[in-house]
């Protein structure tokens, strides 16, 4: 088993070298073939997904799978349409490989270019969500990265079906290296993959807090991702109530099972009387369970709103991924920011305010990869950010941060073009000086 896994990874690693130099035309042709194949084979995809949903129902009944994961697992006709649209959006994006990032003249006829290039071989490990396969494969293909996929057992039929359809489509177009995309399906394969740091350049895990933490703790391979999505909205005393009601409702209710839905609502005491009762009524009608601190519990109880429960200390650190919301009253914007930076996951947090100085203060102090002003946290998404799709959301402080599109799948190399220059001429008593002059030259124009 271990040797089979390693041979798959080595094959993908070799293919990554060839894939890095495949032309934009060939890559776009392969992407269009992928989109057409998904459309043609959608019936087979939906049938495979039904098998997974039946298995998932058994797992949920046994307490081994949450409703949030079951929701993410489901594939519908509209989701297939979304997969197809996502791939075609990637086709429209400019090929990022080989782009000149900067050009510096060191001396006459000694020019240094900084040029973008693929990372190499990327491992993507994910729970549920079969739509991850076309999303990530399209971005990795366009950015010239070979990819190893490992999905959860609950989505095995869907993942295998979609993966096979896409790989056959890619191979049918010609010009693409064989073996650039591989699929692993067993739990044992995960542990083997995590140990192959000699070949795998980056891991992108997508799943629960515990799942991502497990990956981070059991590999030497760099990991890009976030462990949880504990997102907040702070309703400032200078908020427009109508804006606050619609934004806060959307941020929780529109799709509660995802990582950019809010888990905690922070409300300034000076607007609580005006804002919170109607907001709570909207949430309760939508089936949201409200877990309130003492201040919000007292206010809402006096207004006759129910059912309500009291928040525990643990609630502030929980990612519910469900129709559950914690509510807390705060006295100042600083108290709100301190709460977010203490209990949040640095994913996406927002403020509702009409006050420019409050807005500026919040943006400057909150330590989040995305900050929303008078807009729903649900916008924190690669597709909505114009990236075509995303491989995930990162809360890392280095490399990529926030929704990661193709730019997060690239690094760069330095290329120095000279005419026989040697360092000895630029050292010692009579050393030639460097000019270090920025130039507006592109490496692709070099003869």
UniProtKB/Swiss-Prot annotation:
Gene: proA
Tagged with keyword Oxidoreductase: yes
Catalytic activity from the UniProt record: L-glutamate 5-semialdehyde + phosphate + NADP(+) = L-glutamyl 5-phosphate + NADPH + H(+)
InterPro entries for the chain: Ald_DH/histidinol_DH, Ald_DH_C, Ald_DH_N, Aldehyde_DH_dom, G-glutamylP_reductase_CS, Glu-5-SA_DH, GPR_dom
UniProt xrefs under NCBIfam families: PRK00197.1 (NF001221), proA (TIGR00407)
Cell compartment(s), UniProt: Cytoplasm
EC number(s) per entry: 1.2.1.41
Sections of the chain in a coiled coil: none
Single GO MF annotation: glutamate-5-semialdehyde dehydrogenase activity
A GO term from the CC aspect: cytoplasm
Role played: Catalyzes the NADPH-dependent reduction of L-glutamate 5-phosphate into L-glutamate 5-semialdehyde and phosphate. The product spontaneously undergoes cyclization to form 1-pyrroline-5-carboxylate.
Protein name per Swiss-Prot or TrEMBL: Gamma-glutamyl phosphate reductase
Any GO BP: L-proline biosynthetic process
Highest taxon in the source lineage: Archaea
Lineage of the organism: Archaea, Methanobacteriati, Methanobacteriota, Stenosarchaea group, Methanomicrobia
């Amino acid at each position: 088993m271990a040797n089979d896994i390693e041979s798959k990874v080595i094959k993908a690693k070799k293919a990554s070298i060839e894939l890095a130099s495949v032309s934009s035309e060939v890559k776009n042709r392969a992407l269009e073939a992928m989109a057409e194949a998904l459309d043609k084979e959608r019936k087979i995809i939906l049938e495979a997904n039904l098998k997974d949903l039946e298995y998932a129902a058994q797992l949920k009944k046994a307490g081994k799978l949450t409703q949030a994961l079951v929701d993410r697992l489901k594939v519908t006709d509209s989701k297939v349409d979304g997969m197809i649209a996502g791939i075609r959006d990637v086709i429209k994006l400019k090929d990022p490989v080989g782009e000149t990032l900067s050009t510096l003249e060191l001396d006459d006829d000694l020019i240094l270019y900084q040029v973008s290039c693929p990372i190499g071989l990327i491992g993507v490990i994910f729970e549920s969500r079969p739509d991850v396969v076309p999303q990530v494969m399209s971005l990795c293909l366009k950015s010239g990265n070979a990819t190893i996929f490992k999905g959860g057992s609950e989505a095995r039929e869907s993942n295998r079906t979609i993966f096979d359809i896409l790989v056959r489509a890619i191979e049918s177009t010609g010009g693409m290296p064989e073996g650039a995309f591989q699929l692993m399906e067993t739990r044992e394969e995960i542990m083997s993959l995590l140990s192959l740091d000699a070949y795998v350049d980056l891991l992108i895990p997508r799943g629960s807090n515990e799942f991502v933490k497990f990956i981070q703790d059991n590999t030497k391979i760099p990991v890009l991702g976030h462990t949880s999505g504990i997102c907040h909205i702070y309703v400032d005393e200078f908020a427009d109530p109508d804006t606050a009601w619609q934004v806060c409702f959307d941020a929780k209710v529109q799709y509660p099972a995802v990582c950019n839905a809010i888990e905690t609502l922070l409300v300034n005491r000076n607007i609580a009387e005006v804002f919170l009762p109607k907001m709570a009524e909207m949430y309760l009608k939508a089936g949201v369970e409200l877990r309130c601190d003492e201040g919000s519990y007292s206010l809402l109880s006096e207004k006759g709103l129910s059912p309500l429960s009291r928040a525990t200390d643990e609630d502030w650190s929980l990612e519910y991924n469900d129709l559950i919301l914690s509510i807390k009253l705060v006295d100042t914007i600083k108290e709100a920011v301190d709460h977010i930076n203490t209990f949040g996951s640095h994913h996406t947090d927002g403020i509702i305010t009409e006050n420019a100085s409050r807005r500026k203060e919040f943006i400057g102090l909150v330590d989040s990869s995305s900050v929303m002003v008078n807009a729903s946290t649900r916008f924190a998404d690669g597709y909505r950010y114009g990236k075509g799709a995303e491989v995930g959301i990162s809360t890392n402080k280095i490399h990529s941060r926030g929704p990661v599109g193709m730019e997060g799948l690239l690094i760069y190399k330095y290329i120095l073009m000279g005419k026989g220059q040697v360092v000895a001429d630029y050292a010692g008593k009579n050393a030639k000086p460097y000019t270090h002059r920025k130039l507006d030259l592109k490496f692709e124009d070099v003869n």
